[in-house]
Amino acid sequence: MCIRDSNGSYRLGPGSWKLGSIYNSNFKIGTEIRDILNQICEVTGQSAGYWVRAGKKKVCLYRVNSKSELNHYVVEGTTFELNSATGKVLLAYTDKNLELKKEIEKKGYIYTAGERLDNIASVAIPAFDNKNLFKATVSVSGWKQFFTNKTVPKYYKTLSSFSNQLRSLLSNE
């Protein structure tokens, strides 16, 4: 896993890459999820992501970044604190945060702006399998000037329009 350099310092070796590749290959649905994210990205013009909780952080498992020059660019595998819309959905369903869960159940989504980065906003929804077990959160994110009173409900509608496809995929993993 680790390699010692000639100067005596250590760094991650190829074993880490192999382990990560094995982990990722266990998610055979990744291609299908990316296809859905790509469709969401095309409809909204914003970046789309699929996030899961990893301890006290959130990790972006799958991502399609917007093709716009002004986009919110994140690389798959990146971890962040549990804030913004994605973090709040994860907290609502993994920490049993009833206040957040009630908000999501009432509106269907969480919207935040400027929580992690000043100019970035996001809309996130929970993703469930056919047994209604929480699996992840799916979101759109981008520059907050593109998230208005008119566009936020449209982004939610787009996300929710793909929830049945996700539900079916997540039930087969």
Map each language-model feature to its residues.
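Short loop/turn microsegments at loop-to-beta-strand junctions
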Residues: 7, 48, 122-124
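Amphipathic alpha-helical effector-binding/dimerization core
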Residues: 11-96
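A short, hydrophobic, proline-anchored segment that marks a local hinge/packing element in signaling
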Residues: 123-131
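Conserved small/polar residues in nucleotide/adenosyl-binding loops
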Residues: 1-5
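Juxtadomain coupling helices with adjacent low-complexity linkers
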Residues: 97-102, 107-110, 118-119, 136-173
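Residue-level recognition of short loop/turn positions
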Residues: 7, 55, 107, 130-131
